[in-house]
Amino acid sequence: MDKMGRCESVPCCRVLLCYNFVTFKRIASKGLDTMLVASIENAEAHDYLTERLKKAYAFLRENDLGALSCGRHDIDGEDVFANVMEYDTVPAEAKKLEAHKLYYDVQCVAFGIERVEVAPVEGLACAKEYDEADDYALFESPMPATSVVLHAGEIAVLPPEDAHKPGCIAEDAPVHVKKVVVKVRA
């Protein structure tokens, strides 16, 4: 990590900057440049500093995430709420990508480390049709998939058009993870 709290990776000669939560909030709140990786078609559709997303960031900043009980925590009714969970990471091959239509996922690791695979929903092979009651569908993973490793205190903001596979082993062996997923109505 550099002095700005960024980790750098260079896939295919493209540098992606991943900010940890504290640094992202500091930079974004001052109006300084932050990097977002998205397709051109989807980038204009999202404002990553809307009032609802700001409520999600505030919840993550103002709470002791490690002390939160597992289950649902209401923030702003059905518009913004958090699901707290604990699990052991598994090999990526053991999971399917998931996607939502109604909510962004703001995923924050409270402790542990995990890899999250991400791919645009468009063009993915459906493994389970959309379940309207639970707002999710499952998809087969493309090869190769894009992934990011989340450490404690880091977030990934995943819009509805990005399928994602959280909970994957990040290093050599499974680890126990506690994570807060704030659901933000799109």
Give residue ranges: language-model regions.
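Methionine residue identity
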Residues: 1-4
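Short, Lys/Arg-enriched N-terminal segments with co-localized hydrophobic residues
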Residues: 12-34
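A short, N-terminal "cap"/entry segment at the start of jelly-roll beta-barrel domains
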Residues: 29-84, 96-99
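Conserved short histidine dyad/triad with adjacent acidic residue
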Residues: 83-100, 113-124
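Glycine- and acidic-residue-biased ligand/ion/polar-headgroup-sensing regions
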Residues: 102-104, 108-116, 123, 132-136
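A short hydrophobic beta-strand segment most commonly corresponding to one strand
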Residues: 106, 155-157, 174-186
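Non-DNA-binding regulatory cores of transcription-related proteins
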Residues: 128-143
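Conserved metal-binding segment of the jelly-roll/cupin
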Residues: 150-168
